[in-house]
A protein has these predicted regions:
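N-terminal targeting signals for export/organelle localization
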Residues: 1-40, 152-153, 163-166
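Short, conserved catalytic or interaction motifs in soluble domains
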Residues: 13-16, 75, 99, 146
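A short beta-strand-turn-helix
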Residues: 33-35, 40-61, 84-87, 130-132
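Short active-site neighborhood of thiol/selenol oxidoreductases, capturing the structured segment around
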Residues: 52-71, 94
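Loop/turn elements at helix/coil->beta-strand transitions in domains of secreted/extracellular proteins
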Residues: 58-61, 90-93, 117-119, 146
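Structural microenvironment flanking redox-active thiols in thiol-disulfide oxidoreductases
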Residues: 74-115, 124-131
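Thiol/disulfide oxidoreductase modules built on the thioredoxin-like
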Residues: 110-118, 123-168
Length: 171
């Protein structure tokens, strides 16, 4: 009886037609989840230069969602600049998306200068936040590989060394 049951289970699983059409794995994964594709975006950074997904193709990309009032963000950002200084020549880039809230009391350009940040910083509009799957907390860091696939997502503070360990295999 056991052999018959196992045989029927095996036979039932041999259907030639799948229940749903096949889709690329990345397309089936929700935005902002590990394995999802980097969303298409085109934004102006704080000085007014256009930053697009197109110019990031073929690079390892760290996306950082931050705010001027966020203490963990202030601790992380200089480390991301150090990683950019170290790995930029190998095709690594950092883009910072600033949350625009009533808590902001410091000019973001002065804030970046004070922290020694030279990578592009743009405002995280609601549309941008949604394209990245919604942002659950600050800081939120996302690391995409050269094919634009999300390989690491960190919500909250993380030491630069841990981010670097996740980053190095992608370079």
């Amino acid at each position: 009886l056991l052999c018959l049951s196992l045989g029927l289970l095996g036979f039932a699983g041999c259907n030639e037609h799948s229940a749903s059409p096949s889709t690329p794995v990345e397309a089936a994964i929700a935005a902002g989840e590990i394995g999802s594709r980097m969303p298409d975006f085109s934004v102006k950074d704080l000085p007014g230069r256009q930053v697009t997904t197109e110019e990031l193709r073929g690079k390892v990309v760290l996306i950082d969602f931050w705010a001027t009032w966020c203490e963990p963000c202030k601790r992380e950002m200089p480390g991301y600049q150090q990683l950019l200084d170290r790995y930029g020549p190998q095709g690594f880039v950092v883009i910072g998306f600033k949350f625009d809230t009533m808590k902001d009391t410091e000019d973001p350009m002065r804030f970046a200068k004070r922290l020694g940040i030279h990578y592009p910083l743009a405002v995280a509009t609601e549309a941008v936040k949604q394209k990245f799957g919604g942002i659950e907390g600050l800081p939120t860091t996302m690391v995409y590989d050269r094919k634009g696939i999300l390989r690491e997502k960190i919500i909250g503070f993380e030491y630069t060394e841990a981010v670097e360990r996740a980053l190095k295999p992608l370079l």
